[in-house]
Each structure stands twice: as structure tokens, then as C-alpha cells.
Amino acid sequence: MLTLEQIALAVKGEVVGDPAIQIISVDDINEAAKGSITFSFLPKYKTKISSSNASAFVTDSKDDLEGYNGVVVEHPYLAMIKILTLFSKNKDVQHSIHPNTVISESAKIDSDVTIGPFSVIGDDVIIKSGTIIESNVVIHNDVQIGRDCLIHSGVIIGADGFGFTTIDDKHHKIPHIKSVVIGNDVEIGSNCTIDCGSVKNTTINNSCKMDDQVHLAHNVTIGEGCLISGGTFIGGSATIGAHSMLGGKVDIGPHVVTGEKSVFAARSCVLKSVPGGQMYAGNPAREIKEKQKRDAVFTKIEILEKRLKKLTKNEK
């Protein structure tokens, strides 16, 4: 339980209303009750302040809180992160390795690493300080994981990539002799699969964040600070430029190189390399303005087709 004043101090915000009001939970604005604090900085939530049962609101404008208790902040999402952390049950992580974990004797794991039950850590794996590995994670031989990473349940890192050559209808497996290197401050969502490299390491650079069920094929390189949404598949030897954003179920083809700060809309299919600093959408993925022009052409064709049918019908 915290007072509104304590919360305001934590987020460097300004109290509006009663600073001594007691806050016991953080809730959605539609479900908030007495004792709740909620977030109302988006326009669609500002209109719900008057009908909400919350005791306090976090917003970016003092005008929103006339007659209500709340905290005004300059950066609402940073305040949201801080407040959720204050009320999180997991804020005090106990660093430990569960006894049901299987760890190779040759693995090098820093003392303050946390590993959950039924995880498997292979030969010569390196895991650096502050990293948390949840339950049922498999980390294959030679994988390197940097500091302060979070690996969610069900992740498999370092399994063989999908590489075959076919001669006379027989498939010959290509050996994968490299591994996976993960930088610092990386988060990998549940049930992601990251294949090891064949001739070079699969690499995820610092501060990348991956949603659930993302697949990285062999030899992939993910630049620093990328955000990758769920269901995305990145083909072998592809390179994603730093600080790029990939929406849900994006497909990146093998050997494709994307420039820095690219944005790919959900379900984009990227079949060839593209420059950075632009937004892409569609299948095949095109720069968004080009795609919109093409879509407009098809719309006009449909309109003309309907007119033509109407004229033909009238002639009959």
C-alpha cells in the first residue's frame, strides 16, 4: 500500500487532489475500484475518468483531473513502468538455480543468475550476471548469453538450423558447427526458437526485445535495440538493422538485409533487402506510400468494373 504522494515522488510527478489517499492496486480504467490507481493519458481513456471507480489517475495534463485525485507526469509510459514495478509481486527476484535444472559441468554461470526448474544448460555455455532463465528452457552447447537478460519459459536456443542440400532426391544435412551469441539486456519471449549457425554464429545484439513464438534461423544477425513481435519468422543468414520494429507474423526471407530503424507492419513478407528509416507493409513488402498507391489503383479498378457492368446492363 502506498500513498498518492509516495507514488508521485517515485515517478517525479505532481499530485492533484488528496496526497494522503491510500493506493492498494493498479487496475484497468474499466475495472478499477476504490483504492486503485489507473492510467488515463490516452485520449480514449481520458473520456472515461468521470465514469471510473478508481481512486486516482495517472495522466499528462492537469486539466484532466479537475475534481479528481491523480498524478500528472511528463512521460506517462515511463511513469507506468515505474508504478507497475512498485506494485509487482516479482520486484524482489531471488537469484537461485532450481535443483531440477540440468547443467553441464563445463558451463560457466555467474553467481547471481537465476534458472527455473526443468531447464537444460549444455556444454561450455556462458551466462552472465543478472540474467534470469525461466522454467523448461533448453540452451544448447557453446551458447553465450550476456548480462541482465530475461529468457522466458519454453525457449530453445542453439538447436540445429534447417539446412539441407538435395542430390538425386536425397536430402543431405548440412552440419551446424557454430552457436548463438546473445548480448546484454535482451528479452526473449516464451516458446521462441533460435537456431545455431552453420558457418557463423546466430547473433542477437544488446537490448533487443522479442515477443513469444519468434523463430530465428541459422546465421541470423539482429541489430541492437530491435523490437520483434510474436509469430515473426526470420530466415537463414538474414540481417535486421539496429533499432528496427517488426510487427506480428512478419516473415523475413533468407539472406535479406534490412536497414537500421526500419518498421515492418504486421504480416509483412520481406523477400528482398530494403533500406532503413522507412515503413514497409504487404506481401511482398513495399514502402508504405508505394503500397498505398498500388492499393488505390486496385480500388479504382474495382470501381470502374462496377460502373462498366452497370453500363453494360443498361445497354441491354
Model-derived features with residue positions:
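Terminal amphipathic alpha-helical/low-complexity segments used for targeting or macromolecular assembly
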Residues: 1-100, 143, 148, 154-155, ...
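Structural signal for interior beta-strand "rungs" in well-ordered beta-sheet cores
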Residues: 39, 96-287, 292
